[in-house]
Every structure is written in structure tokens, then in C-alpha cells.
């Protein structure tokens, strides 16, 4: 049978056994079913057995996964598929399903070779259909039980989101997390699972999903979706789940357009974003949605995904690409790929696909791949090396610069250097880092070592004149010098206190008149009006000391406690003692 089909062949029901069979195979299947139907049953059938029907598929916790805790484990070819069912999707309105391995199907006495042949035909057609897709798309889960990760919201014990979908309910929500953690897959599975739950329990609503992206959707398209959702509910009582990828790219007008339709239930909004919603989304929209934070997948979870990818690639090798030599990767190689992926499932699968393509011509008798082999493959096919997820305008930008500043303030020169390296590798603007170090020199070192401010300015000039990568050491030098320097926040606290008093016009600090004797008198008229009159020029006196007020008279009169005007208290640091530090000394 040819695997090169231009379209999906229709599945029809067998009139004898009710199984789904491809149209071209129905005649041979009827011959087998007819012969077996005429044979006497090997065991008596009761009414209850006839009514029982096919048994439910085993739950996810009964699946046998690879022992990923075994460090010496190797992924072997021919791993069991995550699901015996083969699902063929032509478009959103047509979905065909064949389940040749259910207990009900197995109860039909059929030669093993015929069953295997049918199963192989189904699988070959499915593999041929998806062979052009990226591996991440091939492995996209079809059932919620196949979804990997995010147990903090999907756990059956205390997962908030799981409680909703168990009741067949989907709330409007924002899925916030880094790339490659499964935001789109989760949204699709929520819609499917909630609809199934509501059908089984007769509680909740039925749903259908419309997907769009904020990078291409406009107000006209959104209005069309809202109108379609109303008509859909009137005709079928199905509620519309509107999934918007990269929702943070919507402007204020587009976000406001969503508000009334989310409010009155015309749509259920699921937005996916890699940016902090509190920075990028309107407060009104946030108040109408639940915020779920999706976390990066850990090593064990990513190894599960990679093992599934290897199993699928080996099937494609054998049945589509006619390559007999299977791909074998050890646990240590999987962990190496996981480390490079930085928690991004899509990136990990892309690297796995790169390894698979690069090893198709390897002979079966060659030595198994080592970490050095994989490192060379990735290095030769990636000009940029390791690319960590770092958005110069997103949360990582603010989180990393905050960690950098606090590490310098705490005097940890190694941590300071580490965060500097993370920012530069992630593509942060080096001038932004240099400007922050200028601020640190005044805020955290201040009067204890005034030479650090010119050093920070010099580092900024070095970046301006030389640029990266040559100026990286100038930034590192300034970073370490700031971390090692003695700290003083006397100036910072004094300035902060004064600004707070000025903002409230305390003691008329912001509105009082400047004293006449310390005003300038550049003209004769101003001199006649009393400007500069009575001013004592300090250099004319011994040690420059004179009795003279510099604060406005109104301020001095309104301030009963003159110590409030002493903004600089002479204390470089505070007087608190850290109990954790005391315990570490005692230990």
C-alpha cells in the first residue's frame, strides 16, 4: 500500500463488528469478520456481557513509562506508543478515530497477522500524514493525561485548574509562562476535556475553540468572532473559547474590546503570554480573568517528552523513511539536551530532531552516540551556541538587573559577575548595565568611596567607544570593584527623606521664600531691594566659620524639632543584626 497519499482516506463502520476500517480495506475485513461470525462462540455470552461494551481505557497512572531515575538507562527502539488509538485529523470539522487495540476489538477472533497488518496500515498512514510537521507538533498531546508538567495547577489533589475542568467548567484565564511550556496545548486540552466531562456528568457546558494570535488579529476579526460565538450558542448551546496567543501584543483598544464580551459570557477568554500580565494587560481585563503561572519543565519531565520523541522518530525511520537503524540515546545525553534547552520543550525537541537528522547515515555497527558527538552536532548546526530565554523588555530583564544590583549591594562579587554574564549573554543592552552601575556607585557606595563614581562613568564611556565584545571586561572590572567596595547609604537615605518631605511640602520646604541674604544681586536694583544684604562670605573668616542661617526663615519657624532638618545623620549603614548570620557563626 502506498504511503504517498494526497488526502486522508475515509473511515467507515463495519456492519458486523462496528469497527472503523479504511474504505479500501472494507472488503477484506468483511471476509474475515464473516468467517469468524459464523464460528460458534468459545464462551457463552450473557446479557450483561453484551451490554457492557468496550472497557474504558486504562488511566494515566497505569501507563508504564521509562524509568527515568535510572542514570544508565538507554532509550531503546520500538517503545510502546503513548496511546494505542490512532487519530487522524483532516480539519477542525472532521475527526476520524480507530481503536484496534481496545478490549472490545480484541474480543473478535481474528488472525494476529491480519490485525497487525491493519494496525500497521493505520499507523503508516498517520505517520505519513504528520511526517512533514516539526517534532514538537507531532508530539502535541491529544489527551490531558498525556500532558507533561504543570502539576501545581493540574494535580488531582490540589490543582485549581483541574477542579474546574473536572466539573466541565472553563473560566476565563491568562496562561503566563516562558516559551515551550505547553500554553497552547493546555488550552486545547482544557476545551476538549471540559466538554467531555460535561457530556459525561450532564453538568457544565459544551465548548468549541477558536484560535487566533495577537500578532495578526485586528478589531474587525474580533468582532466577527464575537458575532459567531453568539450564533453558535443560539444554535448549538456550545460556548466559545477564544484562545489568543501572545495576548500581550494587543494594544489598549483591542484589550478594551474584549471586556464586555468576557463580562457577559459571550466568550471564554484564554490568553497566552510570555510577559508579566500586570505590566502588559489592562487591570480591567486582568480582574475578569484568572492568572495561572506555568513553570519550566524539570529534567525528569523533559526526559519523558524526549523519550516519546525518540519513540516516534524511530517509527518514522522505519515506516516512512525506510531507515532500519534506530536512534539510541543514553540518559546522560538526554540530560545534556535538557540542560541546553533551558526548560523549553520546543527547543529540546528541535535539538533532538537535529540529532536524528545528523545520524541517519550512521551504520548499525558503529559505536553509540556519546555526549561529545552530540555536542559537536549541536555546535556545528548552531552558530549562536546556547541561547537562553532572555527578553530585554520582559520579566527577565527586570528580575536579572534586580538580582545584579542586590548582589553588588550585598558584597557578593561572584554572584554579581554571574548576573552580569547572564545579562550580556541574553542580549541585554550593555549601556543599560553601565548606567545601572553609575547609579549603584552613588546609591550603595556613596560617600564611603567617591572614586567609584568616576570608574562607573569610565565603564560607560568604554562601552560607548569600544562596544561589545571588547568592553565586556570594563563592565566586569567595574562590577567587581563595586561589589568589593565598602558600602554607605547615608546619602541615599538623606536624599530620599528630603524628597519625601518636599513632596508633602512639610514645614513649607517647597514653598518658602529664599532668604534675602543668600540671594544673588547681579543688578543695582536688586541690591537696593535687599538682595545679598548681610551675607557673610565664609572664606573671609577663620576656618570659614560664621553664625549664619541658610534655611528659609519660614521653615525654621515651622519646624519645632530642628533635627528633622538634619538629613545626613553620619551613619553609613543600619544597626540591625541578622539572626541567621549569628547562627552561622555559632555553627
From Swiss-Prot:
ATP binds at residues 177-185. Keywords: ATP-binding, DNA damage, DNA repair, DNA-binding, Magnesium, Metal-binding, Nucleotide-binding, Nucleus, Zinc, Zinc-finger. Present with 1180 molecules/cell in log phase SD medium. It is found in: Nucleus. The lineage of its organism: Eukaryota, Fungi, Dikarya, Ascomycota, Saccharomycotina. GO terms for molecular function: ATP binding; ATP hydrolysis activity; enzyme activator activity; G-quadruplex DNA binding; single-stranded DNA helicase activity; zinc ion binding. It comes from Saccharomyces cerevisiae (strain ATCC 204508 / S288c). SMART domains: AAA, ZnF_Rad18. Belongs to the AAA ATPase family. RarA/MGS1/WRNIP1 subfamily. Its main location: nucleus. InterPro entries: AAA+_ATPase, AAA_assoc_2, AAA_ATPase_RarA/MGS1/WRNIP1, ATPase_AAA_core, DNA_pol3_clamp-load_cplx_C, MgsA_C, P-loop_NTPase, Rad18_UBZ4. A zinc finger (UBZ4-type) spans 11-38. GO terms for cellular component: cytoplasm; nucleus. Zn(2+) binds at residues 14, 17, 29, 33. This is DNA-dependent ATPase MGS1. SUPFAM superfamilies: P-loop containing nucleoside triphosphate hydrolases, post-AAA+ oligomerization domain-like. It holds the Pfam family MgsA_C. Its cofactor is Mg(2+). Signal peptide: none annotated. One of its GO terms (biological process) is DNA-templated DNA replication. The keyword Magnesium applies. Residues 35-62 are annotated as: Disordered. Involved in the maintenance of proper DNA topology and chromosome integrity via annealing of single-stranded DNA breaks. Modulates DNA polymerase delta during replication or replication-associated repair. May function as a modulator for SGS1 when DNA is damaged. PANTHER family: ATPASE WRNIP1, WERNER HELICASE-INTERACTING PROTEIN 1 FAMILY MEMBER.
Amino acid at each position: 500500500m502506498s504511503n504517498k497519499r494526497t488526502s486522508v482516506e475515509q473511515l467507515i463502520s463495519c456492519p458486523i463488528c462496528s469497527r472503523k476500517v479504511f474504505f479500501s480495506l472494507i472488503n477484506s475485513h468483511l471476509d474475515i469478520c464473516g468467517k469468524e461470525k459464523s464460528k460458534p462462540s468459545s464462551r457463552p455470552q450473557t446479557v450483561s456481557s453484551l451490554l457492557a461494551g468496550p472497557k474504558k481505557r486504562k488511566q494515566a497512572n497505569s501507563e508504564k513509562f521509562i524509568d527515568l531515575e535510572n542514570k544508565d538507562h538507554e532509550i531503546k527502539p520500538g517503545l510502546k506508543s503513548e496511546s494505542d488509538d490512532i487519530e487522524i485529523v483532516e480539519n477542525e470539522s472532521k475527526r476520524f478515530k480507530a481503536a484496534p487495540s481496545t478490549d472490545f476489538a480484541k474480543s473478535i477472533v481474528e488472525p494476529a497477522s491480519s490485525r497487525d497488518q491493519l494496525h500497521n496500515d493505520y499507523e503508516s498512514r498517520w505517520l505519513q500524514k504528520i511526517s512533514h510537521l516539526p517534532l514538537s507538533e507531532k508530539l502535541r498531546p491529544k489527551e490531558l493525561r498525556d500532558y507533561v508538567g504543570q502539576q501545581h495547577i493540574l494535580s488531582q489533589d490540589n490543582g485549581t485548574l483541574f477542579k474546574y475542568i473536572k466539573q466541565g467548567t472553563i473560566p476565563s484565564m491568562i496562561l503566563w509562562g516562558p516559551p515551550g511550556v505547553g500554553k497552547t496545548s493546555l488550552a486545547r486540552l482544557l476545551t476538549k476535556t471540559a466538554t467531555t466531562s460535561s457530556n459525561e456528568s450532564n453538568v457544565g457546558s459544551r465548548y468549541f475553540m477558536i484560535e487566533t494570535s495577537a500578532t495578526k488579529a485586528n478589531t474587525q476579526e474580533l468582532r466577527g468572532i464575537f458575532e459567531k460565538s453568539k450564533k453558535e450558542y443560539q444554535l448549538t448551546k456550545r460556548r466559545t473559547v477564544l484562545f489568543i496567543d501572545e495576548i500581550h501584543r494587543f494594544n489598549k483598544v483591542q484589550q478594551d474590546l474584549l471586556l464586555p464580551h468576557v463580562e457577559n459570557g459571550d466568550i471564554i477568554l484564554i490568553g497566552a503570554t510570555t510577559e508579566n500580565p500586570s505590566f502588559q494587560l489592562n487591570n480591567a481585563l486582568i480582574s475578569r480573568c484568572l492568572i495561572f503561572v506555568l513553570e519550566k519543565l524539570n529534567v525528569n519531565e523533559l526526559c519523558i517528552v524526549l523519550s516519546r520523541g525518540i519513540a516516534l522518530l524511530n517509527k518514522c525511520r522505519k515506516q516512512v523513511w525506510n531507515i532500519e537503524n534506530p536512534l539510541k540515546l543514553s540518559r546522560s545525553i538526554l540530560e545534556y539536551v535538557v540542560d541546553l534547552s533551558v526548560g523549553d520543550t520546543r527547543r529540546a525537541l528541535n535539538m533532538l530532531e537535529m540529532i536524528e537528522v545528523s545520524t541517519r547515515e550512521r551504520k548499525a555497527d558503529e559505536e553509540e552516540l556519546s555526549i561529545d558527538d552530540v555536542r559537536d552536532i549541536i555546535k556545528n548546526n548552531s552558530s549562536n551556541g546556547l541561547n537562553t530565554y532572555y527578553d530585554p523588555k520582559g520579566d527577565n530583564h527586570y528580575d536579572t538587573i534586580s538580582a545584579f544590583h542586590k548582589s553588588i549591594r550585598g558584597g557578593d562579587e561572584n554572584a554579581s559577575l554571574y548576573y552580569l554574564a547572564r545579562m550580556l549573554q541574553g542580549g541585554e543592552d550593555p549601556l543599560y548595565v553601565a548606567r545601572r552601575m553609575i547609579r549603584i556607585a552613588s546609591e550603595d557606595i556613596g560617600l564611603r568611596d567617591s572614586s567609584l563614581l568616576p570608574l562607573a562613568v569610565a565603564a560607560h564611556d568604554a562601552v560607548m567607544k569600544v562596544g561589545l565584545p571588547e568592553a565586556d571586561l570594563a563592565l566586569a572590572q567595574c562590577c567587581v570593584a563595586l561589589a568589593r567596595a565598602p558600602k554607605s547609604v547615608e546619602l541615599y537615605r538623606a536624599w530620599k527623606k528630603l524628597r519625601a518631605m518636599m513632596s508633602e511640602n512639610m514645614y513649607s520646604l517647597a514653598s518658602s521664600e529664599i532668604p534675602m541674604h543668600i540671594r544673588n544681586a547681579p543688578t543695582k536694583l536688586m541690591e537696593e531691594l535687599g538682595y545679598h544684604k548681610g551675607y557673610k562670605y565664609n572664606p573671609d573668616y577663620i576656618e570659614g566659620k560664621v553664625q549664619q542661617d541658610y534655611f528659609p526663615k519660614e521653615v525654621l519657624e515651622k519646624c519645632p524639632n530642628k533635627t528633622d532638618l538634619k538629613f545626613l545623620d553620619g551613619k553609613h549603614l543600619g544597626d540591625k543584626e541578622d539572626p541567621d548570620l549569628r547562627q552561622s557563626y555559632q555553627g
